[in-house]
Every structure is written in structure tokens, then in C-alpha cells.
Regions:
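N-terminal secretory signal peptides that target proteins for export/translocation
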Residues: 1-10
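Terminal, low-structured helical/coil segments at or just beyond the last alpha-helical repeat
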Residues: 207-254
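Hydrophobic face of amphipathic alpha-helices that form TPR/SEL1-like repeat modules
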Residues: 37-45, 71-81, 105-112, 141-149, ...
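Alpha-helical segment of the N-proximal tetratricopeptide repeat
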Residues: 34-64, 75-78
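Short helix-capping/linker turns of helical repeat alpha-solenoids
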Residues: 33, 63-67, 78-80, 96-100, ...
Length: 254
């Protein structure tokens, strides 16, 4: 017969054994920790101006599947290292794994022909990917490209409106022009005035503010007092509601 004290020892040994297994597991680096650590080290090197060391760290992180490392490599090649082909390669690699900012940057590369030939179809494709992920710059650039494509005026207006909804001042100015010209939407001077007001409210640079004010001033020479008052009322309401409610009529197509 086994003594009782030995039974107690056996029951105590089992949880202690598993405790040490758990402790070792928790303290060991996971697969996710490796690229994160390499990215952080690379960022530290970048801040110190040690770009070759940053490059090495981020390439190591890229090899283990980090989309953030791919994006940072694209950023490094695009800026400091001035290599458009390598920048496009890594931006596109990150974009393919769903990195939204990388998708915008790939669109820019194809639109401008940097590191590749100009390819507007590919630019539209990549802007579309980021646009559906709620990136206002992608939505604006997509709208700008579609505006130049025959039969795409309505779709262009839609994306300008979606970008405007996210607070893009240039998109509001583009909407104003569409309402004045009836491009992709019915002519409507009141809504053009609203769009100018919102562009002025959201703009952060003097040039953009002055363009929206100038356009609004020209509009007011063609509008009645009642139209101007209505435009001002709608603008105030739109700002108070943080652009959400007003977009239903700014986005409306003919």
C-alpha cells in the first residue's frame, strides 16, 4: 500500500510541472513578436538616420510575412533611398495583403508612372481597393481619374461625395464644380454653394480656401437671396451633424 504522504507529493508535482510548461510558453517569443520587434528596431534605426540598418531589419520582418514591414520598405525606398522600382515592389506586396495606405501608394505609382509605365487601369483598380476601405484620398483620386473616362461622370461624382463625407475639402470643391456644370448630377447652384461653404470650412491651406471663396462669390452673382439663405442653412446643418445627414443630397445622382 502506498503511503498517504506520497500521494500528496504526486498530486502536487503535476500542477507544478504544468506551471513551468506554461511559464516557458508565455515567456518564449511568438511568431507575431518577431516581426514586431524587428519593425521597432528598424524604426529606432530610422529615427537615428541609420537607414541601412533600418532596411536590414525591415527586410528580415518582410521575409516572415509582415505587411507593415513591406509598407515601411516601400516608404524607405520611395523617400530616402529614391528607388521607385523597389518602392513599387514593396508597396504592391503590402497592398496585396490588404494594407490600405500601400494600396493608395501603388495607385499613385501607376497613375504617375513611377517605377513602372503609366497605367491608369491599374491605378483605378488600386484606388478602388483603398476607396472601399474608406480612404478619402483614394476616393478623391479615383473620382478624379474616373472623371476623365467617358461615361463615368456619375460614378466619379459618387466617389467625390464619399470622399467629401470623410472630410476631404478638395472633394467638396469638386462637388461644387459638378453641381455648377451638371456633370454626373443635375445642375444645382444651391448645392454648389453648400459644397463651397464646406470646402472653406474644412480647408487647411490658404490656396484651397481662396479658391472655394472665389467660386462661392461667383455663384452668388447668379443666385437669389432665398437660394443663398437656403445654402447657408443647409451648410450649418451639415456642419452641426458632422456631414452625415447632408451627404444624402450631395451624393444624389441625376
Amino acid at each position: 500500500m502506498i503511503p498517504k504522504k506520497n500521494i500528496k507529493i504526486k498530486f502536487l508535482e503535476i500542477p507544478i510541472f504544468f506551471f513551468f510548461i506554461w511559464l516557458c510558453f508565455c515567456n518564449s517569443p511568438t511568431k507575431a513578436d518577431l516581426p514586431r520587434g524587428l519593425i521597432t528596431e528598424g524604426l529606432n534605426f530610422y529615427d537615428e538616420g541609420k537607414y541601412a540598418d533600418a532596411l536590414q531589419k525591415w527586410k528580415s520582418a518582410s521575409k516572415v510575412g509582415s505587411q507593415e514591414a513591406d509598407f515601411l520598405l516601400g516608404f524607405l525606398y520611395d523617400g530616402i533611398l529614391q528607388n521607385d522600382k523597389e518602392a513599387l515592389f514593396f508597396f504592391e506586396k503590402a497592398a496585396l495583403s490588404g494594407h490600405v495606405q500601400a494600396q493608395v501608394n501603388v495607385g499613385l505609382k501607376y497613375e504617375r508612372g513611377e517605377g513602372t509605365n503609366v497605367n491608369k487601369d491599374k491605378a483605378i483598380y488600386w484606388y478602388s481597393q483603398a476607396a472601399f476601405n474608406q480612404d478619402d484620398i483614394a476616393q478623391f483620386r479615383l473620382a478624379s481619374l474616373l472623371q476623365k473616362v467617358s461615361g463615368k461622370a456619375r460614378e466619379s461624382h459618387f466617389w467625390f461625395a464619399k470622399s467629401a463625407e470623410l472630410g476631404n475639402a478638395e472633394a467638396h470643391l469638386a462637388l461644387a464644380t459638378n453641381f455648377i456644370l451638371g456633370r454626373g448630377v443635375g445642375k444645382n447652384l444651391t448645392l454648389a454653394h453648400v459644397s463651397c461653404n464646406l470646402a472653406t470650412f474644412l480647408s487647411r491651406d490658404i490656396d484651397s480656401i481662396s479658391r472655394s471663396i472665389q467660386l462661392r462669390t461667383e455663384l452668388e452673382t447668379k443666385m437669389s437671396t432665398d437660394q443663398i439663405k437656403e445654402a447657408e442653412r443647409l451648410s450649418r446643418k451639415c456642419i452641426e451633424k458632422k456631414f452625415k445627414e447632408c451627404m444624402s443630397y450631395l451624393i444624389e445622382l441625376e
